[in-house]
Amino acid sequence: MLNSLDLEGRPQDTRVVVAMSGGVDSSATAALLKSQGYDVVGITLQLYDHGAATHRKGACCAGQDIHDARAVAERIGIPHYVLDYESRFRESVIDSFADSYALGETPVPCIECNRSVKFRDLLATARELGASALATGHYVSSRRLDDGSRALICAADRDRDQSYFLFATTREQLDFLRFPLGDMTKPQTRELARQFGLSVADKHDSQDICFVPTGRYTDVVERLKPNAMEPGEIVDLNGHVLGSHPGIVHFTVGQRRGLGIASRAPLYVLRLDAAHRRVVVGPREALRMERIVLRDVNWIGDGAIDQAVGDGLELFVRVRSTRAPQPAWLRAVGGGYEVELVAGEEGVSPGQACVFYDAADGQARVLGGGFIKSAAPRWSADGVRDDAASPALAAMRG
């Protein structure tokens, strides 16, 4: 007989570690599992030097959060531990964040944190404590498959769905993870927290990168990668110099405001050339990308990825966490993987994730994804389709 977490045994005989960030979501998760009779242990990771972020409204993982998590644990009567992971977090997340920006990318540190810290080290700690599962407050679900493994499923509340940030979860990790809030909305979670008498029921949602206390990511990059602040040229698609800039770290793909150059027509950042310290700008139509080259691909669909992809796999992808899944094709090309966006997408930025889904709506299954290495436009600068860079995609288009 399986319990409500799809685990063998009675709840009272099942230990579950809850990753408690100090926010309402993870707090409600811990309280809910405790009320269902599980043997709950709360763990909070101290990830960075809190400093100026300690009491800033909307910050995540700040010093106040540790206090809040401890207070919730005391309220619901569970043991609570704080683990110092500052060194690991700095090496795995903060340093790579700065490196990525210095390369002209737009990183997603939450994905790296989940992959390199929370779902690796914290999961290992949960096992050492004799837990049968690690539960989090993410808005995402998992479903038990016929073979006993688990599939990652989008949250019922699509406005809160966090599946984009969890695509790098491995199959082994997914089998051990549980997401009790996957079928709930945020208002329902807050109401649940009120029913349990939790002090964080009305706490502000985290909105910022937790280790950027001022809200200015450039401060972090400047401190760790000062070369990213070196000035350079702003050029058009033909290489004509239009102006200068104080450092590529100040720009992102798709940006229009703050370019500091005069033009009769609106110009947008199309590409960041870190090697030459150049910001390439052009018209909005040049932002539309059709082909994406991926790196660090993770597959959590059925079977092996090569068998699933074959000569081409039709699926849906998200290239930003705030965008809806769009139809695409996934293909194996030259020892790696490429995605063709059927309708194209604007503002596809290297460093972001391209996440695979089996459907565009409803509680779709996450099939995996990869990080965007590069993207090619629907049209080249001279108005010709850019098929030459990918023979496989050119053949598919006919």
UniProtKB/Swiss-Prot annotation:
Its EC number is 2.8.1.13. ATP binds at A19, M20, S21, G22, G23, V24, D25, S26, L45, G137. InterPro entries: MnmA-like (IPR004506), MnmA-like_C (IPR046885), MnmA-like_central (IPR046884), MnmA-like_central_sf (IPR023382), Rossmann-like_a/b/a_fold (IPR014729). Pfam families: tRNA_Me_trans, tRNA_Me_trans_C, tRNA_Me_trans_M. The record marks H138, Q352 as: Interaction with tRNA. It is an enzyme of class 2 (transferase). GO terms for cellular component: cytoplasm. Disulfide bonds join C113-C210. GO terms for biological process: tRNA wobble position uridine thiolation. Residues 160-162 are annotated as: Interaction with tRNA. Keywords: ATP-binding, Cytoplasm, Disulfide bond, Nucleotide-binding, RNA-binding, Transferase, tRNA processing, tRNA-binding. GO terms for molecular function: ATP binding; tRNA binding; tRNA-uridine 2-sulfurtransferase activity. It catalyses: S-sulfanyl-L-cysteinyl-[protein] + uridine(34) in tRNA + AH2 + ATP = 2-thiouridine(34) in tRNA + L-cysteinyl-[protein] + A + AMP + diphosphate + H(+). Signal peptide: none annotated. The active site is at C113, C210. Gene3D superfamilies: Adenine nucleotide alpha hydrolases-like domains, HUPs, Translation factors. It is found in: Cytoplasm. The keyword RNA-binding applies. Belongs to the MnmA/TRMU family. Catalyzes the 2-thiolation of uridine at the wobble position (U34) of tRNA, leading to the formation of s(2)U34. This is tRNA-specific 2-thiouridylase MnmA. It comes from Rhodopseudomonas palustris (strain BisB5).
